[in-house]
């Protein structure tokens, strides 16, 4: 069974970056196309609102104000308007930042972790190997990996719940496009 607990899911975005089409589409051109910084709000009946990634926030521009990180915003220009961050959109929906108890991070690119610091009570669920791949990198290598360490809160490690350390892998039905699955909340 994939899930036994009904949850609602809202797919949202907080800004977008521009990148040449040919880097992601076979036969694409060099024209820049928008790639929305998507995130999801899951409403769980027992655990409350849960975020899957955050998209960008204005903090991205603070973190990329100086070299070498400023190269990031020139190589991959970001378009973000005040009022579209995850924290602001959730407030509009009546959800305070402190209500987010869990945040699932797919990986550590800036368009996925841009708003992480806006949620002071959230615990972070992620695959240990995805964090291990970036967190000790120097400034240039981190930049090449799309990782801006300043987007993470100072107490990130203390608030971390690496899923592969607390939850066993779950079997997947044949034909699934993923190789790993975990029951993040122990509810099926």
Feature-to-residue mapping (PLM):
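Catalytic metal-binding/acid-base residues of hydrolase active sites
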Residues: 55-57, 109, 130
């Amino acid at each position: 069974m994939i899930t036994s607990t009904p949850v609602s899911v809202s797919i949202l975005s907080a800004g977008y970056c521009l990148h040449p089409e040919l880097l992601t589409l076979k036969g694409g051109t060099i024209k820049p196309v928008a790639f929305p910084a998507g995130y999801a709000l899951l409403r769980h009946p027992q655990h409350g609102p849960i975020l899957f990634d955050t998209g960008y926030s204005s903090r991205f521009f603070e973190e990329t104000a100086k070299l070498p990180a400023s190269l990031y915003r020139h190589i991959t220009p970001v378009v973000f308007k005040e009022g579209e961050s995850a924290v602001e959109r959730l407030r509009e929906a009546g959800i305070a930042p402190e209500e987010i108890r869990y945040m699932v991070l797919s990986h550590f690119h800036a368009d996925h972790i841009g708003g992480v610091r806006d949620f002071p009570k959230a615990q972070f669920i992620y695959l240990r190997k995805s964090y291990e791949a970036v967190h000790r990198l120097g400034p240039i290598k981190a930049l090449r990996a799309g990782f801006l360490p300043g987007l993470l809160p100072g107490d990130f490690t203390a608030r971390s719940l690496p899923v592969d350390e607390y939850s066993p892998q779950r079997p997947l039905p044949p034909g699934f496009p993923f190789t790993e699955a975990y029951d993040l909340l122990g509810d099926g």
